[in-house]
Amino acid sequence: MGIMTSLRQGDVHRVTAETDVLVRVGLDGCGQCNVSTGVAFLDHMLHQLSSHGLLDLEITATGDTHIDDHHTNEDVGIAVGQALSQALGDRRGIHRFGHFVAPLDEALVQVVLDCSGRPHFSYGLQIPSQRIGSYDSELVKEFFVAVVNNSGLTLHIRQLAGTNSHHIVEACFKAFARALRMAIEIDPRRAGAVPSSKGVLEQAGGQKS
């Protein structure tokens, strides 16, 4: 992997009997992306996340894609979620909340999220086709479930319009990227304080900051 200079950075290496995944995320980046998961459509969506979220993202993965893409897709999501949580740390100084509505031609998708430390996922995509190229459309939900459970995000995804499966999913990733970018950016008025009236936010895994 290349050199990353982001001040807020997460590095995760996940190895199982099914996959070997290495993820590096820089929150204060400019959208540099070097991704190779062996799942072409997932790579395309991760490029959207990096580009529109201004995340520096490096991911390499090998897995049992000769069976199907499920394990690689899920384990990449797990590692991305863990890397995000690691990079956010105690979440001091961030805006915390983010929202965005992204269009792609006829598709329109809304994403609202909270870097709360409490994982919750509400999913409202209605993808008309079972596959997008060779990618199983059900894996979109599984990717975000893995990210949410390992990052501690509260994430709501709503499809407002759309008939083309590729457009719907790409609009979703773009909206997620922009909402995440809004939430993780530093708020200078907070002066480094935790963005919670309790003075503390939980990190993924239930560890309080």
Curated annotation (Swiss-Prot):
Chief location of this protein within or outside the cell: cytoplasm
GO annotations of cellular component type: cytoplasm
Coiled coil: none
Catalyzed reaction equations: D-erythro-1-(imidazol-4-yl)glycerol 3-phosphate = 3-(imidazol-4-yl)-2-oxopropyl phosphate + H2O
Cell compartment(s), UniProt: Cytoplasm
Pfam family, one: IGPD
Pathway: Amino-acid biosynthesis; L-histidine biosynthesis; L-histidine from 5-phospho-alpha-D-ribose 1-diphosphate: step 6/9
GO molecular function, one term: imidazoleglycerol-phosphate dehydratase activity
Single biological process term from Gene Ontology: L-histidine biosynthetic process
Enzyme Commission (EC) number: 4.2.1.19
Domain of life per record: Bacteria
Gene3D superfamilies for the chain: Imidazole glycerol phosphate dehydratase, domain 1 (3.30.230.40)
Keywords, comma-separated and alphabetical: Amino-acid biosynthesis, Cytoplasm, Histidine biosynthesis, Lyase
Enzyme class: lyase
Entries under NCBIfam families matching the protein: PRK00951.1-3 (NF002108), PRK00951.1-5 (NF002109), PRK00951.2-1 (NF002111), PRK00951.2-4 (NF002114)
PANTHER family: IMIDAZOLEGLYCEROL-PHOSPHATE DEHYDRATASE, IMIDAZOLEGLYCEROL-PHOSPHATE DEHYDRATASE HIS7
Sequence similarity: Belongs to the imidazoleglycerol-phosphate dehydratase family.
Name assigned to this protein: Imidazoleglycerol-phosphate dehydratase
Gene source species: Prochlorococcus marinus (strain MIT 9303)
Lineage: Bacteria, Bacillati, Cyanobacteriota, Cyanophyceae, Synechococcales
Gene name of the record: hisB
